[in-house]
Structures are given as structure tokens and as C-alpha cells.
UniProtKB/Swiss-Prot annotation:
SUPFAM superfamilies: GroEL apical domain-like, GroEL equatorial domain-like, GroEL-intermediate domain like. GO terms for cellular component: cytoplasm. Together with its co-chaperonin GroES, plays an essential role in assisting protein folding. The GroEL-GroES system forms a nano-cage that allows encapsulation of the non-native substrate proteins and provides a physical environment optimized to promote and accelerate protein folding. ATP binds at residues 30-33, 51, 87-91, 415, 496. This is Chaperonin GroEL 1.
Length: 543
């Protein structure tokens, strides 16, 4: 075990605070509409240019081990806020640094760190209640666009695109962000349920130009096991032929004789049919087949449920308005399932999401939820250079997370105004003793930090902005840093999701309060490099 270096009390806190300040100084320049870019060197390829606080924080590693410990703890604030709310990382970093800076001063002056921590926790809890109470529910597509625009650093096209995507796929729908092959940024929406299985034989293709199967008003047979021969299916196939409608078969696999018979029938024109493999594996496959059954108002044919293939009637088949099958994907559009049964299934999946502890399971359940709820939207981010695409993708990711958070918990005035106004929740709050009250005052001062930084990044003195807003009785009045004017933030569309503001403060308060109470820091003593081997003497090749 290697020897350790230990720092105590003021010495430890000073070194830790230095690391926090270095990280915060690099991150805080990105805050607000006039925030600056940070250029990050990469081991290979072009440097990365970003205005995303968490991306900057994740790149910072300091040479001094004690300074680095402080920086890494605040980096944790940014990461945690990003994981929970998806945005607000720079705000969280600025708040944490402010709380820690003030707290370290008071500890150095002889105050009790544990009492200061109690005061900080008490104040944060009171402010969170205030933010939740003041949050306004997001109702219109225009409000969603405003949130997206602010989170994307004032890019209105991004805000409009996200609002359109959410409008198409619903609040539970999946919206993914990918890099495009072109210079344009575009939105691609897949309506209905899509899964990643294509046709089992190219002979099923009905549209030779696009190499895809198009079935109008088809019946859908959902079968859990493999189909090896069609003997058991003959009654249902005859019933489908008489109905004159096409048939989509979804099963674990269709092989050998069964597949050959279907292909021959399709080519002869007797039966419009296509077969695809069931999506997923194991228990997840069964669950997805049940989802398809709910969506199409059909029944899953499973011997576990006591249903045999030879006993299937046409009423047990699912129905859809349209089915499109390509080489690798199948899309079921406008299934016949009733709204009530689909909503019941959605509620069941939401319950499973809340119960599961596995991130992987959660992601897969979320995908199933989206497919049932309305579809998938893909925002393809274009740009002239790779650096531009990556920078834009960072902003769109932030904007997407912010809009989801806004839909979840509502919006509050943006630009740091919500935190500044939330100081009113602390005006009558007193601690059990003077040190606890001092902890409350630390948070009171820290609530000004984000708006000060936004003002300073736009070239305006922060104290003047804070003073002017403090004098006003209008709770929505704030500083529009883009145009350097004072406006009603809600009317001007400068809003933040309440969840982002709340999470940023909670995470900042939690980590900063812990760091204030740290009394010792321990790190490895760096190993000294071994002395280089001596050079060869005379006659050893050193002519």
C-alpha cells in the first residue's frame, strides 16, 4: 500500500476551494444567451467546441491531487444534475461554488460546519417548496418551443423543431438526436409502432421501386412460437382469403415449408401476405407481442393462454389501417386498438418503469411505452464541419431534456430570476442558533449567483441587475441578457423548467454542504520516478 499525504482543516479547504474555483471559472463562461464557447483539445481529431457546462466539467482533471478532489466533487454536481434534469449543469456549478466559497469563509472564522450544513439544507428545502409552488404548467406547443429555444441558447429553429416533434409523438414518445449526413438539420417522424424486424423473404415485396411491402387494411396474426408448416393455419388462411384483405404474420420465425407455401400463394396472387419475425428476445419478445396485440385489437396466439393455431378465428386477428415493411423495419400505422385498452397498457408499463432498478430495463420499457404512445421522432443534426455538428448536437440534447422537464413539472421565469425571487421564502426563516442562521444566509446570497453570472457574461455589471430587480415588486420582471433590457420573463418567453432549477439547487446544496464539513483530505503521495540508468563508460561504444 502506497504512502498517503494528508491535509487538515483550513489547508485542506483552501486547496479544495482552489480546485473548485478553477473548474467553475471554466464552466461559468458558458452560462446564458451570451455565454462563450470553450475549446477542448482531443487526443485525435479536431478540438471540440462547446457551450455545454457538463461537457466542459467532465474534461477537467487537475495536476494537484487536493485541488483535483475539489474539482471532481463539483463535477459530480454537474453530472448528477445532467442525469436527473438533463440541463442546468452550469447553474448547478455556479451555485455550488458560491455556497462553498461563503461556507469556507465562515468555517475559517470559527463557525460550526455541521450547523452551517443544517442551515444550508433548511434553506434549500424552503426554496424548493417555493419554486414548485410558483411553477406554471406548460400547455401549448408555443410554450414548449420557448423552453427549447432558451435551452438551445436562443436558437428558435431548434425550439420549433422540438415542439413539432413532441406534438407528433406525444410527451411519452421517443425523440432521438442523431448526426446527419447533410448540412441541414431536419426532423423525421415515424408514426405508429415500429420495430426492427424486416420481411422474411424479398418475394413478399409489393412496391419494387422502394423495395418494401405495403399492406392496406391488413389483418395481423400474432403468434408466439415458430411456424414450420401451415396445416394448422389453413382454416384461418381461407377465412382471410374470403375477406379479400391482406395478412401480416408476426411470429418467432416462419421457416421451411411454411415460408415456401406463403411465398407461392403471394406470387400466384391468391393471398396478399407478408411474414416478419417477432421483435425482441425471451420475455421481452412476449411482452412486445402483447403490446402489438393491444395496439391492433388482436389476440396473441399462445399455448400458454390455451389458444391453439387451428382454433383461431378471424375475430382473434389484429387489424391496422396500414403496414409498411422494409428490409430491416416493420411499421404498424393506426392499429384498431381502443384508446382505453392502449392507455391501460401504457399505465402498466409506466408502473414497471417506476419499479425497475436496471437502467437497461428502464430504457427498453421506455421504448415500448413510446411505441404504444404514438411513435418515434428523430432530429438529424446537420452542419458544415464535424465540430459544428457536435456543438449543435450538444445544444439540441440540452433543449430536448429541458422541454421534457418543463412538461413534467412546469416552467418558472428564466435567466436566474426564479432563484432570485425565491429568496422571499427565506426572509422569515431562522435557525436554531446563530450558525444555522448563517447557513441560511449562505444560500440567500448564492441565489443571486446565476443571474449575476448571466449579466456579466453579457457585459453588464451583475450588482446593478440584481439591485434593479430587488427593487421591483413584479415577480416576473427579469434581465433579458440577449437584448440587455428588463422585461416580463414569462411574456417574453424567457423561461426555465422548474425541474431544472430545483434539481440544480438541490444538487449544488447537497455537495457544497458536504465539502464545507470536510476536515481532512487524503491522497496518494506520487511515486518518484526511478533515476535514469547511467551512460556507458569508455570503451563501451562511446567512442
Amino acid at each position: 500500500m502506497s504512502a498517503k499525504e494528508i491535509k487538515f482543516a483550513t489547508d485542506a479547504r483552501d486547496r479544495m476551494l482552489r480546485g473548485v474555483e478553477i473548474l467553475t471559472n471554466a464552466v461559468k463562461v458558458t452560462l446564458g444567451p451570451k455565454g462563450r464557447n470553450v475549446i477542448i483539445d482531443k487526443a485525435y481529431g479536431a478540438p471540440r467546441i462547446t457551450k455545454d457546462g457538463v461537457t466542459v466539467a467532465k474534461e477537467i482533471e487537475l495536476a494537484d491531487k487536493f485541488e483535483n478532489m475539489g474539482a471532481q466533487m463539483v463535477r459530480e454536481v454537474a453530472s448528477k444534475t445532467n442525469d436527473l434534469a438533463g440541463d442546468g449543469t452550469t447553474t448547478a456549478t455556479v451555485l455550488a461554488a458560491s455556497i462553498l466559497r461563503e461556507g469556507a469563509k465562515l468555517v475559517a472564522a470559527g463557525m460550526n460546519p455541521m450547523d452551517l450544513k443544517r442551515g444550508i439544507d433548511q434553506a434549500v428545502a424552503a426554496v424548493v417548496v417555493e419554486i414548485k409552488a410558483k411553477a406554471k404548467k406548460v400547455k401549448s406547443s408555443a410554450e414548449i418551443a420557448q423552453v427549447g429555444t432558451i435551452a438551445a441558447n436562443g436558437d428558435a429553429t431548434v425550439g420549433a423543431m422540438i415542439a413539432k416533434a413532441m406534438d407528433k409523438v406525444g410527451n411519452d414518445g421517443v425523440i432521438t438526436v442523431e448526426e446527419a449526413k447533410t448540412a441541414e438539420t431536419e426532423l423525421d417522424v415515424v408514426e405508429g409502432m415500429q420495430f426492427d424486424r424486416g420481411y422474411l423473404s424479398p418475394y413478399f415485396v409489393t412496391n419494387a421501386d422502394k423495395m418494401r411491402v405495403e399492406l392496406e387494411e391488413p389483418y395481423v396474426l400474432i403468434h408466439e412460437k415458430k411456424l414450420g408448416n401451415l396445416q394448422a393455419m389453413l382454416p384461418i388462411l381461407e377465412a382471410v382469403v374470403q375477406s379479400g384483405r391482406p395478412l401480416l404474420i408476426i411470429s418467432e420465425d416462419v421457416e421451411g415449408e411454411a415460408l415456401a407455401t406463403l411465398v407461392v400463394n403471394k406470387l400466384r396472387g391468391g393471398l396478399k401476405v407478408a411474414a416478419v419475425k417477432a421483435p425482441g428476445f425471451g420475455d421481452r419478445r412476449k411482452a412486445m407481442l402483447e403490446d402489438i396485440a393491444v395496439l391492433t385489437a388482436g389476440q396473441m396466439i399462445s399455448e400458454d393462454l390455451g389458444i391453439k393455431l387451428e382454433n383461431v378465428t378471424i375475430e382473434m386477428l389484429g387489424r391496422a389501417k396500414r403496414v409498411l415493411i422494409e428490409k430491416d423495419t416493420t411499421t404498424i400505422i393506426d392499429g384498431a386498438g381502443t384508446k382505453a385498452t392502449i392507455q391501460a397498457r401504457v399505465a402498466q408499463i409506466k408502473g414497471q418503469i417506476e419499479e425497475t432498478t436496471s437502467d437497461y430495463d428502464k430504457e427498453k420499457l421506455q421504448e415500448r411505452l413510446a411505441k404504444l404512445s404514438g411513435g418515434v421522432a428523430v432530429i438529424r443534426v446537420g452542419g458544415v464541419t464535424e465540430s459544428e455538428v457536435k456543438e449543435k448536437k450538444d445544444r439540441i440534447d440540452d433543449a430536448l431534456n429541458a422541454t421534457r422537464a418543463a412538461v413534467e413539472e412546469g416552467i418558472v421565469p428564466g435567466g436566474g430570476v426564479a432563484l432570485l425571487r425565491a429568496r422571499s421564502a427565506l426572509s422569515g426563516l431562522n435557525g436554531a442558533n446563530a450558525d444555522v442562521t448563517a447557513g441560511i444566509s449562505i444560500v440567500l446570497r448564492a441565489l443571486e449567483a446565476p443571474i449575476r453570472q448571466i449579466a456579466e457574461n453579457s457585459g453588464v455589471e451583475g450588482s446593478i441587475v440584481v439591485g434593479k430587480l430587488a427593487d421591483s415588486k413584479d415577480h416576473n420582471l427579469g434581465f433579458d441578457a440577449q437584448n440587455e433590457t428588463y422585461v416580463d420573463m414569462i411574456k417574453a418567453g424567457i423561461v426555465d423548467p422548474a425541474k431544472v432549477v430545483r434539481t440544480a439547487l438541490q444538487d449544488a446544496g447537497s455537495i457544497a454542504a458536504l465539502l464545507i464539513t470536510a476536515e481532512a483530505m487524503i491522497t496518494d503521495i506520487p511515486a518518484k520516478d526511478a533515476a535514469p540508468a547511467g551512460g556507458g563508460g569508455g570503451g563501451m561504444g562511446g567512442y
